[in-house]
Design a protein with these regions (language model features):
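Bacterial N-terminal signal peptides
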Residues: 12-25
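Long, intrinsically disordered, low-complexity accessory segments associated with secretion
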Residues: 2, 8, 26-505
Length: 505
């Protein structure tokens, strides 16, 4: 097999290298201060210095702040030795999903001496098709295999690439124009200077004095997200529970962040929607930590909440990982059952006398308070509920979503529907008393097939200007449009609620 040069198998070319968005670059130009523009001739000569390149190896600090809206703020601090004068700096190992317009570069050592003249984001990334396109008009070595009796002979041919349209190259070999030539791989003499193996930020810097400087590049990137996941384990007697909270962090940004300080922002941060948003759909691996004490410190920040991990962590590209957020034990919890009516019941004559079967919903509620073992702002997320069985095993019984919940607020978790309790609703009467004035009567029947008594809350959403004409059970006005009834049902028994309301629309 021939050696030397830059080789690429044509059969596997498209799979060997990756394609990122489309060819091009993002550029931003800044005026040089007049006093700097009038630099002496010696500095002008320094301006022709070769490009400097910095990679992840130069990092001295890295901060990653992730928002639960699919973005993250990256602050990458590096220690560099910078020449004097005007010169380009290539800043590699940035996220592939970077938002170029958000990039900011500054010197932390001597900001007054270091200025950014021009900023470019280079994303004309190397792949097989682009490499061929860049070599149009240039000579390439074609390598193909010829089979002998017991071996393969590798034959090299010099060819001028005339065109490459739709991955169908046209060659000039000697005095002939050749297409469709079978080739095992191509050999290129060099990598074109305007192709990049990874997304790269390129700054043209104007530096007043040579020396070591600590610089910071900050930018926003898409395709990093976090959400909270909770495990609520309810005791057998359904009076206490344990709540464990986890942060699930997902990184599909196209970069890994090694030994980073991690912070999370909970809250709805407003963003101007872009015309086109690229969405990575990469299935990541899940790295789940074992149960551990909470590792985040919480603080308020404007109208949001900031959670800071108390240690550094590494966030690999295409990875999901979980980190303990909180742990509350012996949290008082209350189980309740409910049937919930619909507001349209009070606007129509709904098949008088015909029963409607409705689910009896199972909820758990608890207060997010310090004396109950909690008392910190809870980010929005999924609560998965478990309960111990008679053998002591833990069984999954349902899940629900919660919104961002401040401390001292009550959470209500919908788990599922009761199996052994049946609810039937009947409209017994519907009358029009006058223009826009109606009166209607409803009956709710509950049949309890359990060996213990239960109490079911019936919540009825009534619109308009309403009043309860009569009811066989006590009722409570919850708000302007909702009344509530507590319906006790004996074990293996039946209970009925009858009530009549008058509504003016």
């Amino acid at each position: 097999m021939p050696t030397g040069g830059f080789k690429l198998s044509s059969a596997r070319a498209l799979a060997a290298l990756f394609l990122f968005f489309s060819a091009g670059s993002f550029s931003r130009v800044q005026a040089v201060p007049q006093e700097r523009a009038a630099a002496p001739a010696a500095a002008e000569r320094t301006a022709q210095a070769e490009s400097s390149t910095t990679t992840q190896k130069d990092q001295v600090d890295l901060n990653v702040t992730v928002y639960n809206s699919n973005i993250a703020l990256i602050r990458d601090v590096r220690q560099l030795h910078l020449a004097s004068g005007t010169f380009p700096l290539r800043f590699e190992d940035v996220a592939a999903s970077i938002m170029p317009a958000t990039v900011h570069f500054r010197s932390l050592t001597d900001p007054a001496k270091l200025n950014v003249v021009e900023q470019n984001y280079e994303y004309d990334l190397l792949d097989a098709q682009k490499l061929l396109q860049k070599y149009v008009g240039r000579e390439i070595t074609l390598v193909r295999g010829e089979q002998d009796a017991n071996s393969t002979k590798w034959v090299e041919t010099k060819a001028l690439l005339l065109a490459d349209n739709n991955n169908e190259p046209v060659w000039k070999i000697g005095n002939e124009i050749v297409t469709g030539m079978p080739t095992s791989w191509y050999r290129f003499s060099e990598l074109p200077g305007n192709l990049y193996s990874r997304p790269t930020l390129v700054w043209t810097l104007d530096n007043a004095g040579a020396g070591s400087q600590k610089v910071e590049a900050s930018y926003l990137t898409n395709n990093m997200n976090w959400n909270a996941d909770y495990v609520l384990t309810v005791a057998r007697d359904e009076k206490t529970s344990d709540l464990d909270g986890w942060v699930t962090l997902t990184n599909n940004s196209g970069a890994s962040f090694v030994n980073a300080k991690l912070q999370l922002v909970a809250g709805e941060v407003h963003q101007v929607p872009p015309a086109v948003r690229a969405r990575a759909e990469i299935a990541g691996q899940l790295s789940t930590a074992m149960a551990a004490p909470p590792q985040f410190q919480q603080e308020g920040m404007s109208e949001y909440h900031l959670y800071t991990l108390g240690r550094r962590t590494t966030i690999q590209n295409n990875e999901s990982k979980q980190i303990s957020l909180l742990s509350g034990t012996n949290v008082p919890v209350e189980k309740f059952l409910a049937v919930e009516g619909q507001s349209y019941y009070y606007r129509t004559q709904d098949r008088i006398g015909n029963p409607i079967t409705e689910p009896v919903k199972l909820y758990y509620r608890f207060k997010n308070e310090e004396k109950g073992g909690l008392g910190m702002p809870l980010p929005a997320g999924t609560v998965r509920v478990y309960q111990a069985d008679s053998k002591g095993g833990i069984q999954f019984i349902g899940e629900d979503q919660i919104d961002h919940t401040p401390k001292d607020e009550t959470l209500k978790i919908y788990v599922g529907n009761a199996f052994d309790i049946v609810c039937e609703r009947k409209q017994l009467d519907y009358k029009k008393l006058a223009n826009n004035l109606y009166e209607m009567e409803y009956q709710i029947t509950l049949r309890n097939h359990k060996d213990v008594p239960v109490t079911v809350e019936a919540r009825e959403p009534i619109g308009g200007d309403w009043e309860v004409v009569n009811s066989n059970l006590k009722w409570t006005k919850l708000d302007a449009t909702t009344i509530s009834f507590e319906i006790p049902v004996e074990k293996n028994g039946t209970a009925t609620l009858d009530y009549r309301v008058r509504v003016k629309w």
